[in-house]
From Swiss-Prot:
Substrate binds at residue 140. Gene3D superfamilies: NAD(P)-binding Rossmann-like Domain (3.40.50.720). It comes from the Bacteria. One of its GO terms (molecular function) is cis-1,2-dihydro-1,2-dihydroxynaphthalene dehydrogenase activity. The lineage of its organism: Bacteria, Pseudomonadati, Pseudomonadota, Gammaproteobacteria, Pseudomonadales. This is 1,2-dihydroxy-1,2-dihydronaphthalene dehydrogenase. Belongs to the short-chain dehydrogenases/reductases (SDR) family. The gene is nahB. It comes from Pseudomonas putida. NAD(+) binds at residues 8-32.
Length: 259
């Protein structure tokens, strides 16, 4: 495959992940994608034909992450960037809920929002070291401020900040590690099955656009295509070569507080 850049993206079947696939393809990258079901696979196949390497599976399963990387290498020959993007929300789950509900939701949210990032990076790392590649994680405005979710979700996204700093330090100079903190973005982000929120989608919440407008100094709710540019910067070997341990916020000023 020559010198063309290769990126692998988890959570690639909807929302920001789907827009990342589109943006990196438009930028000339080869792309491999991990999606959670056949419906998402069919959507990608319809749009991109056979241009992508697609794996269907559970991002919490380490064997699935290893499969994603193996198939990426088998098809494209190398890996330049791994984007850990899969995530779920907690729909403002309160600490006052029954403990069993909190405990199971906490485990599910941290397994997907935190542990799956470790798993994917672990699987990708041997190949990234070969290419002096990079990792980009999806953090959140909730990594920096409250109000964008319940305590389980906010805690999981704060954990991503620690992961970025620790891994950037540990893996330098071979591999760069950074993150993007989107906020105020209307997507199909679902919730935890443990709390019964897995069939819900943020974009379907009544009044979600107006709620975000009220929380965002710039005064509008973003779409996925509005928040992907920092990922391209951080993945770039040219523009991003001196960036590591950095988290770029793209939230319309939401972390600043209400205007």
């Amino acid at each position: 495959m020559g010198n063309q850049q290769v990126v692998s993206i988890t959570g690639a079947g909807s929302g920001i992940g789907l827009e990342l696939v589109r943006s990196f393809k438009s930028a000339g990258y080869y792309v491999s994608a991990l999606v959670r079901n056949e419906e998402q696979e069919a959507l990608l196949c319809k749009e991109f034909k056979d241009a992508l390497e697609i794996v269907v599976g559970d991002v919490r399963d380490h064997a699935t992450n290893e499969k994603l990387i193996k198939q990426t290498i088998d098809r494209f020959g190398h890996l330049d960037c791994f984007i850990a993007n899969a995530g779920i929300w907690d729909y403002m789950l309160s600490i006052e809920e029954p403990w069993e509900k909190i405990s199971s939701s906490f485990d599910e949210i941290f397994d997907i929002n935190v542990k799956s990032y470790f798993s994917g990076i672990s699987a990708a790392l041997p190949e990234l070291k070969k290419t002096n590649g990079s990792v980009v994680m999806t953090a959140s405005v909730s990594s920096h401020a409250v109000g964008g979710g319940g305590s389980c979700y906010i805690a999981s996204k704060h954990a991503v900040l620690g992961m970025v700093k620790a891994l950037a330090y540990e893996l330098a100079p071979e591999v760069r590690v950074n993150a993007v903190s989107p906020g105020g973005t209307v997507t199909s982000l679902c919730g935890s099955a443990s709390a019964g929120f897995d069939k819900m989608h943020m974009k379907d919440m009544p009044g979600i656009d107006d709620m975000i407008k009220g929380l965002t100094p710039l005064g509008f709710a973003a779409k996925p295509e509005d928040v992907v540019a920092p990922y391209l910067l951080l993945a770039s070997r040219k523009q991003g070569k001196f960036i590591t341990g950095t988290v770029i916020s793209i939230d319309g000023g939401m972390a600043l507080g209400r205007k």
